[in-house]
Every structure is written in C-alpha cells, then in structure tokens.
Amino acid sequence: MTVIKMPKQSNGTVHSSKDLRQLIDYVINPEKTNDFEYVSGQNILDVHSTCDEMLATRTMANTLKNKPRKNERFGYHFVQSFSPDDHLTPEQVHEIGLKTMKEYLGSSAEFIIATHTDKPHLHNHIVLNATNPLTLNKFQQNKNDLERLKEISDRISKEYGCKIIVRPEQKLGNSHKNYLVYLAKNSYRKEIKN
C-alpha cells in the first residue's frame, strides 16, 4: 500500500534557507538512509551539498530575472510511504520514488530523494527545489497536480506489486447554479410571508 503526501505541519512547503538546510539534513541522515546508500538526486552534483546547490539556483534566478523575492517558497517536501505488507526492498522503494518524481516533474527539476529504512515501513522523503534550474521559474502546483502525482505513484507502485488504496472520487463543492436552486427552494422569505 503506497501513500504519497505533503506533510501537514508545513503543508509541504519550505519558507527559509535555514528550514531547507534542516530538512535536507534530516532527509539524508546516514542513520536513516543506511550511510547515504539510499540517497540520490536529479540535477544535483553532490547530495552532501544539496542545500547549497538549491540556494545557488535560487540566487541565480533572482539575479538573472532581477526579481528578488521575499517570503517565498524555497522548496517542497513530499513523503512516499509503503506498507511492510508489500515486502519491498529499500532499493525497490527508492527506485519507485525516483521513477514517480521523474515522471511527475520531468528532467529539468532539481530534487533529492532519500529512502528511510529506520522504521518498519520504508518511506521516501523528497525535497524539491522551488526554482527550476533550467527555466529559473518557480514550481507551481495545484490540487489537480497533487492528484496526478498520486496517480503516477499508484501506477508505478502497482508495477512492483504494491497494494493500491482505492480513493473515493473527490466531491467538488456545489456550483453557484446549484446554490441558487437551493436558495429558491429554501427561502426564508416564504416563511416570513406566511
């Protein structure tokens, strides 16, 4: 059973260089990743200098685009968890995570992925640079994108024999038209007139 999400406490966003450094230090912790065996990245030269590389990309974007930004997002944090019942190896979990993120983000994104093996359930932590190193644009994501990420994760996980959580179809809020129909049927004005 595979679940991919953004942590609730931060809503998956990193808002400072200090937080980015702390997050990356936690994610690549050698005690959790079997001495960095299950740590890799895309468009990262050295996983040990990931934070510096991501901050350099951000600085370059701000300089070249001449748009220094304040209170912006420095990165995004995703967690992809697997059930012990799926009997996956750490290598397989890491591979699933890499394939998922490469398909979701494309080849130009800058991210690091680390598979934590310190708990009974194996899980990937992914830290994505909010600034794309090739386009120098910011990463944009909406609810539909997160659903697309979940679908990609489910499909790739299924290829490795993982059980998939069946998600109920998402209910969208009432449309304005439905709201007007409801008001017409349930108007308090009729009650006042009577």
Role assignments for model-derived ranges:
Residues 1-194:
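N-terminal nicking endonuclease/strand-transfer module with a His-rich metal-binding environment
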